[in-house]
């Protein structure tokens, strides 16, 4: 509109003074160019850059405007759990062995923390007095395919994060997973399967000389497979009351949003091999691990922001 009015004024003055149309057009273009400050393009660029920088600090970098329009119409967000909402660093926080419940401090794959009973730390040098607890932690080391290594100033894992969490818990109790594996050389194994819901390893042992079959998997399965329970350093008969109590502990831990695993064992003849028939009967129950995957701090804020914007957040997980 301003350009049209400016052109009309130039044309009117030009006609009154008898200028040629081409001359009047040149005057109009010159007036239009002179009306725009020389620094305006730079000012616009700086303003846009500052705006983008401010949006970037809020994690809102836009490349396609339709994406923003779609987000503005969103009412529900469905998100994966492991590695998205959580850190993908499984951490053992509870242990149940020998009829006692233990708390494990620390987070992630850094083996810094302690095991507590009734709020009091269980010293690593006194771990032998807690035979069932030690046996549970050792079983988590040998019936395990993960690796925990200290490289370049940080702890790294190789393998499944759930199995790595068992190694971290053992180290917090002063148990070295690699030393236990050397003492109990693996002779045979049963890989984990979703049908069986457990995995097992047959390991050589110093005492007794017969190999030991360690089984690790779903608590309901292992409780059903067990006929005895390790308590006070002795394998005692597993009564129906004991079974119900173990199932209640499993339900209690699961109710705290913990992933629960169980371990059991049995001693086999020297010539025996690991097979499902042997792994599913006459086991000695050791105990339970309760573990969680800590949430990402930024995920907590993102979910709060989404809820504040009226967006429902639904977690989709394989658990």
Mark where each language-model region is:
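Conserved cytosolic headpiece of P-type ATPases
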Residues: 1-318
């Amino acid at each position: 509109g301003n350009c049209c009015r400016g052109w009309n004024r130039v044309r009117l003055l030009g006609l009154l003074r008898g200028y040629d149309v081409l001359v009047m057009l040149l005057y109009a273009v010159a007036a239009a160019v002179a009306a725009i400050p020389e620094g305006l393009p730079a000012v616009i660029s700086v303003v846009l850059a500052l705006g983008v920088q401010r949006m970037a600090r809020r994690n809102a970098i836009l490349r396609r405007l339709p994406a923003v329009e779609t987000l503005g119409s969103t009412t529900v967000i469905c998100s994966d759990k492991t590695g998205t909402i959580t850190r993908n660093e499984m951490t053992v926080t509870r242990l149940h062995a020998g009829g006692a419940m233990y708390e494990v401090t620390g987070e992630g794959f850094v083996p810094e923390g302690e095991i507590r009973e009734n709020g009091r730390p269980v010293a690593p040098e006194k771990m032998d007095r807690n035979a069932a607890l030690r046996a549970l932690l050792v079983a988590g080391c040998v019936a395990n395919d993960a690796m925990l290594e200290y490289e370049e100033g940080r702890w790294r894992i190789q393998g499944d994060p759930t199995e790595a969490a068992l190694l971290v818990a053992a180290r917090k109790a002063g148990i070295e997973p690699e030393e236990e594996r050397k003492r109990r050389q693996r002779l045979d194994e049963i890989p984990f399967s979703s049908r069986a819901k457990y995995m097992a390893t047959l390991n050589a042992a110093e005492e007794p000389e017969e190999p030991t079959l360690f089984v690790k998997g779903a608590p309901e399965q292992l409780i059903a497979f067990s006929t005895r329970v390790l308590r006070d350093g002795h394998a005692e008969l597993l009564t129906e009351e004991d079974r119900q109590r173990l199932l209640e502990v499993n339900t209690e831990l699961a109710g705290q949003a913990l992933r629960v695993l169980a371990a059991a064992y049995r001693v086999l003849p020297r010539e025996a091999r690991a097979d499902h028939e042997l792994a599913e009967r006459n086991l000695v129950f050791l105990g339970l691990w309760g573990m969680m995957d800590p949430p990402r701090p930024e995920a907590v804020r993102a979910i709060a922001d989404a809820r504040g914007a009226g967006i429902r957040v639904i977690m989709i997980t394989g658990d």
